[in-house]
């Protein structure tokens, strides 16, 4: 970064990484609850996506009516993390940086006391569903793709937290159904086939989960192409983290 401090050295990185571990632990060890307010927000965004008609003219890439969806979200909500959680309104694309914005939105909500840590997963599952609807309906472009060497051209967290949900089970993948986040993520994967997903199919869920956390850190949080436009704020500051100050 131009100011001499890399994202992984910031307080924001330390906090969001710790938040991931907290959510992971909650999914494994606590009954998950719903937050009516946040589910209502996502239901409203689902309505916006569903009711916005596609542009009927020939479209080479993303359908231009997606701009209408972005405008409605921007006009309805003023939270910068939430506004930027559904893609880029100029490029009409979506990727893990936008997914990270939604995680940051939930972190800020958690810090304000608006949600408990045991509400995060249920909100995320609904968010994943909306994103898939938005991408498939309006043909949003992937904001960076690893092709067959990646998990998914658009999303990562459904696999990470989906594996958290399965760590205390002995279920094999072929025994899963649509009630499990990981199964839905694989079945509705956006993009081509994934060699990584195939290679880990026979591993135990705890191993898959640990690998997903490491991979998310390496491929999302530590990638400047993802974090170069990170939105810093009250709870996710650009200050150097205490751990790095002590080095």
Curated annotation (Swiss-Prot):
It is an enzyme of class 5 (isomerase). Keywords: Cytoplasm, Isomerase, Rotamase. Gene3D superfamilies: 1.20.120.1150. Its EC number is 5.2.1.8. The keyword Coiled coil does not apply. Pfam families: PTPA. Its main location: cytoplasm. GO terms for molecular function: peptidyl-prolyl cis-trans isomerase activity; protein tyrosine phosphatase activator activity. GO terms for biological process: mitotic spindle organization. It is found in: Cytoplasm. It catalyses: [protein]-peptidylproline (omega=180) = [protein]-peptidylproline (omega=0). The keyword Cytoplasm applies. GO terms for cellular component: cytoplasm; nucleus; protein phosphatase type 2A complex. Signal peptide: none annotated. Disulfide bonds: none annotated. InterPro entries: Phstyr_phstse_ac (IPR004327), PTPA_C_lid (IPR043170), PTPA_sf (IPR037218). PPIases accelerate the folding of proteins. It catalyzes the cis-trans isomerization of proline imidic peptide bonds in oligopeptides. Acts as a regulatory subunit for PP2A-like phosphatases modulating their activity or substrate specificity, probably by inducing a conformational change in the catalytic subunit, a direct target of the PPIase. Can reactivate inactive phosphatase PP2A-phosphatase methylesterase complexes (PP2Ai) in presence of ATP and Mg(2+) by dissociating the inactive form from the complex. Belongs to the PTPA-type PPIase family. This is Serine/threonine-protein phosphatase 2A activator. It comes from Encephalitozoon cuniculi (strain GB-M1) (Microsporidian parasite).
